[in-house]
Amino acid sequence: MPRRDRIKPSFEDDESFENEFDYRYKRGKEQTSLNSDNENSESGSGSEQEEHENEHDVDDEMASISFGALNRAQARLKQEQLRRSQRDYESDSDSDSAPEETSSSSQPTNKKRSKHAPAVSSTKKPVSRIRDIPGLPSRKSQTLHSDIRFDAAYGKADLNQARKNYAFLDEYRKQEIANMESILKDKKSKLNESEKEEIRLQLQSLKSRMDSLKNRDLENLILKEYKKKQYQNVKEGKSSQPHFLKRSDKRKILQKAKFDSMKPKQRERAMERKRKKRLGKEFRQLEFRPLN
């Protein structure tokens, strides 16, 4: 059967279709509808022959479609399938879960957040049973070092009372100092130089700690005696009200009491350290600085 010549229509003039594929697709549908009408009116043998010819016509029409139109049609079909599958998935999830109300807070807004607004946390992170409150110690620090004697909830720590309660530790410190000195003096000891040096450092640290504790005890004793004397004067009528020391006066009284309690060699050593400190300060003030 000879192939019939066809004239392609100009799609630019046809405003009812977007592209060539829509035109071809609609024309094929019209041909199939005409064939179905002819089948009802004509006999079986004639209708089969015409149907066969019409199928060939539709195939020829589809074969003449350009590749660009086919690509666009394929992309549109993929988008439609994706949209349909997403719609089915959303309908399934909505049927399984309870209906939720859409709130305006879920929608993102460009409004600036207030600093007093509640904090936003992730829903993926499990909520702890004990929540951390800003401004208070964290739960981890409390579990690491928890000692009710030094808890802030019981008020400020009283160093004087703690010193009285643990005064018996001085005996252990003195005994430890004596043991270290005996080890260092023992010439038959099998310790190497590094171990001896470590013991010397520990001994020096322990002695300095004992000296600082003694100085603190002496300061507390002097201030306590001064307060007691002032209240005694008020009680006897020698003064109308007690005199409270300023920081500079307190420093002078403590320094005088320390020098009085020192031995002559200790006093000379302290005076020498003080003189060197003052001399170094004067040299730093008078040192030569080159002009730029």
Swiss-Prot record:
Region (Disordered): 1-145, 255-292
Entry keyword Coiled coil: yes
Coiled coil: 173-217
Keyword rRNA processing on entry: yes
Biased composition (Acidic residues): 48-62
Residue stretches of biased makeup (Low complexity): 35-47
Name under which the protein is recorded: rRNA biogenesis protein RRP36
Source organism (scientific name): Lodderomyces elongisporus (strain ATCC 11503 / CBS 2605 / JCM 1781 / NBRC 1676 / NRRL YB-4239)
Gene: RRP36
